[in-house]
């Protein structure tokens, strides 16, 4: 079977399994397997696959047909240009979260006293902490999560990106993970925000493969925003900022939660599709 035939056959199979963008997915899986950029496949359409390559591709396509995410099959994804290993213990880093990380490192860059210190609350794979650490060479980052398995992955990702010495990993439930008296210039978080009952309606790639702990924001999806609004103040320095990602359609409710806890809501930022997705607040 040639590269082109393999792509066509795989795309047809994935299409029947209702996988979105089946041809692209087939190409990405084959390119990863052959260790070449996707575009290079186009120069190799006539190349014959070996038996071992065909068997490996068949296995990958079977898994993708069962709606396992591409990132889990390939074992990694890119976040702000940094390579992140992914597994079932942490949310796959999403492109929209890159904007939160960028706002975070832009703010830390304006701080005069150095080193600045940042908390990534609910760190998961560690993607936000790692991107900010990489972009702010003077910053120290604390990355907290309730899941030991997610923290093990985050530590692996920090080491892989040669940033382990500037990121401290803390396990615990909410702010109980932190030492009393700890204070940060920036608290950044992408917490779980899906209403519990909506989880069953999500695509299988999310519903069956992202950990429920990373998705479930309680009955209305807003539990973590109430928690942060009520408990984060003592952990923020007087000139510090809080930046939180939230779900599409949650902006008004979240703004109200923070204002009723006497936070100053500085901005609600939109993503590239003009949907409000990030809250910026201060004391
Ligand atoms: C939506 S994921 C975000 C992961 C990562 N920050 C990202 O943007 O890809 C939320 C994370 O919150 C963690 N989490 C859930 N409940 C928690 C709690 N009570 N205290 C601390 N972390 C919690 C989960 O383990 C998960 O890693």
Labelled PLM ranges:
Residues 219-281:
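Conserved Class I SAM-dependent methyltransferase catalytic core
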Residues 30-107:
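Conserved AdoMet
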Residues 193-223:
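Mobile active-site "lid"/loop adjacent to the S-adenosyl-L-methionine
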Residues 95-201:
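Conserved SAM/SAH cofactor-binding pocket of Class I
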Residues 14, 108, 158, 232, ...:
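Conserved hydrophobic residues forming the short capping helix/wall of the S-adenosyl-L-methionine
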Residues 29, 67, 97, 128, ...:
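Residue-level signal for inorganic ion chemistry
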Residues 163, 210, 236-238:
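Helix-to-beta-strand junctions that scaffold the AdoMet/dcAdoMet cofactor pocket
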Residues 1-42, 46-49:
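Non-catalytic accessory regions of SAM-dependent methyltransferases
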